[in-house]
């Protein structure tokens, strides 16, 4: 196991965590070069729909009582995966993906994602297969499945 994964607790997000989750999403999104300029110019693009939390579609990773990351799963689509940047490489993202994959399988679905180019190696290391490029709001995204 990775350095943080064994200490992580996974649970569903609560409505009162919406703002904290969006702030985490903003920090993680702006850490990468892929779409930083577009995201800074279009702050509305960093958004976690409250309905995803209300519908039980957001899995939170907690480390020592603090939110360390989250995954949003809509059907079989990994709609978002965000981990605090200073915790990257510690196994939290992988733990969230495993939980999302388990939930998708429980529904009889494959887990799919439209990833940013920087994340391709990470997703491949988590068992995803590249299927091709797809257009996104800010440029090509990578369609992957597991």
Report each predicted region and the residues it spans.
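Conserved N-terminal entry element of GNAT/NAT acetyltransferase domains
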Residues: 1-16
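Conserved GNAT-fold acetyl-CoA-binding loop/helix
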Residues: 18, 22-48
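A short helix-loop-beta-strand connector motif used in the catalytic cores of GNAT acetyltransferases and
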Residues: 49-60, 77
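Conserved beta-strand in the GNAT
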Residues: 60, 66-82
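Residue-level recognition of the GNAT/N-acetyltransferase active site
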Residues: 79, 84-88, 116
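Conserved acetyl-CoA pyrophosphate-binding loop and the N-cap/start of the following alpha-helix
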Residues: 87, 91-99
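Conserved active-site alpha-helix within GNAT-family acetyltransferase domains
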Residues: 94, 116-141
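Conserved GNAT acetyl-CoA-binding A-motif
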Residues: 104-116
């Amino acid at each position: 196991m990775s350095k943080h994964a064994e200490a992580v607790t996974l649970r569903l997000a609560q409505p009162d965590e919406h703002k904290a989750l969006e702030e985490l999403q903003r920090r993680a999104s702006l850490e990468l070069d892929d779409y930083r300029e577009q995201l800074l110019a279009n702050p509305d693009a960093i958004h976690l729909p409250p309905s995803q939390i209300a519908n039980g579609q957001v899995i939170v990773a907690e480390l020592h009582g603090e939110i360390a990351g989250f995954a949003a799963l809509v059907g079989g689509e990994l709609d978002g995966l965000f981990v605090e940047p200073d915790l990257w490489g510690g196994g939290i993202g992988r733990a969230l993906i495993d939980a999302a994959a388990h939930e998708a399988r429980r529904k009889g679905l494959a887990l799919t994602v439209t990833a940013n180019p920087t994340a391709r190696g990470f997703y491949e290391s988590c068992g995803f297969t590249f299927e091709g490029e797809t257009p996104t709001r800010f440029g090509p995204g990578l369609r992957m499945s597991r």
